Amino acid sequence: MSVNPKAFPLADSGLTQQILDLVQQASHYKQLRKGANEATKTLNRGISEFIVMAADTEPIEILLHLPLLCEDKNVPYVFVPSKAALGRACGVSRPVISASITTNEASDLLPQIQAIKLAIEKLLI
């Protein structure tokens, strides 16, 4: 399991933990879409807060269309080291290569989502 050098920006271990915790909470609040195809749909519909991708995806090219789309739509994106850990955080028994946290104005998660978005945007600079 190796992290692909094309996976930029890669979250450090502290941020990865925060992101995975938020992904887990978002799945309880029904604010999570799992998989590259569903992440693409949320971007096209304009309901994505940010995108999380797995850096150990093989081949990584199957999700490299997402950063381009994120930049078009001005949505932050980040890579986490492990698809297995992302899958566990999503509450699925399989590895997940991509997930999208979706928008909900009345959500209890809004402050955490804003904090993570800010941290991701700092990585992109």
UniProtKB/Swiss-Prot annotation:
It is found in: Nucleus, Nucleolus. Keywords: mRNA processing, mRNA splicing, Nucleus, Ribonucleoprotein, Ribosome biogenesis, RNA-binding, rRNA processing, Spliceosome. Its main location: nucleus. SUPFAM superfamilies: L30e-like (SSF55315). One of its GO terms (molecular function) is RNA binding. It comes from the Eukaryota. InterPro entries: eL8/uL1-like, H/ACA_rnp_Nhp2-like, Ribosomal_eL30-like_sf, Ribosomal_eL8-like_CS, Ribosomal_eL8/eL30/eS12/Gad45, Ribosomal_eL8/Nhp2. CDD domains: SNU13. GO terms for cellular component: box C/D methylation guide snoRNP complex; nucleolus; precatalytic spliceosome; small-subunit processome; U4/U6 x U5 tri-snRNP complex. GO terms for biological process: maturation of SSU-rRNA; mRNA splicing, via spliceosome; snoRNA guided rRNA 2'-O-methylation. PANTHER family: RIBOSOMAL PROTEIN L7AE FAMILY MEMBER. Component of the U3 snoRNP particle. Binds to the C'/D and B/C motifs in U3 snoRNA. Component of the 25S U4/U6.U5 tri-snRNP particle, a subcomplex of the spliceosome. Binds to the 5' stem-loop of U4 snRNA. Belongs to the eukaryotic ribosomal protein eL8 family. Common component of the spliceosome and rRNA processing machinery. In association with the spliceosomal U4/U6.U5 tri-snRNP particle, required for splicing of pre-mRNA. In association with box C/D snoRNPs, required for processing of pre-ribosomal RNA (rRNA) and site-specific 2'-O-methylation of substrate RNAs. Essential for the accumulation and stability of U4 snRNA, U6 snRNA, and box C/D snoRNAs. This is 13 kDa ribonucleoprotein-associated protein. It comes from Schizosaccharomyces pombe (strain 972 / ATCC 24843) (Fission yeast). The lineage of its organism: Eukaryota, Fungi, Dikarya, Ascomycota, Taphrinomycotina. The gene is snu13.
